[in-house]
Amino acid sequence: MSIEYEEIDSIYLRNEPIYEIIRKCNDDILIVEIFSKEYESNDFVLFYFSDSVKSEKIIQLTNEYAQQNAVVIGVCKKSISIIDKKFVELKNQFDLVFENLTETQFEDLVEACYGTKSGEIHGEPYDWILLKSKNDNLCYVISAEGDSINDVTELISEKLKQKLTKDNAKKTNLICSLEKQNSDSLIMSDVATSINKISEVIEARTKMEVKLWYYFQNKNLVKKYKLVCVFS
């Protein structure tokens, strides 16, 4: 995937956050709504739960969002298949499912969803449905932080290779969300160069195709760059 400088130049910069992140707790279930201020509706709703929660309870909560035009994502701390006998019905409640995610990985996923429309390079929520294969909606998320583009590129490429081997993950669609510490001097041509470089390395080393890129500035980063990859 190659992004041209002219293409980026035509995308208007975000002066005000377009999203608001709303967190709700219902016993052992964390619900994160990514609310679009532009359309006054949720673009994403993420459910984070443990394998001790009964399917009926989660299904009841997801049904409350059924009429919303949102991407609904289920995230289990362990395997969703060991919750109870209704796990198949539960999986079907979600557009996408993630398993065995730590709290840190879940927050990485929230950031990637937030980056969908919040950054200087952005897309649409339903781009995420590209991750869904014909027979399964199981997806994966990994991240890497570093003080240079080379650092995050090397780290993320190695993590991707390990994940593909360990979990026999499908080599299909890959969404990448690049975050950078806030900078007064944002040069979009430099961003384009960085993104194209990362894409080339990832695609060469993993044989995966980078389908979508998001880019936004994050003042809360510990290091200069962070790259979050979501794939099926």
Residues of each region from the PLM?
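Tubulin/FtsZ superfamily GTPase core signature
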Residues: 1-232
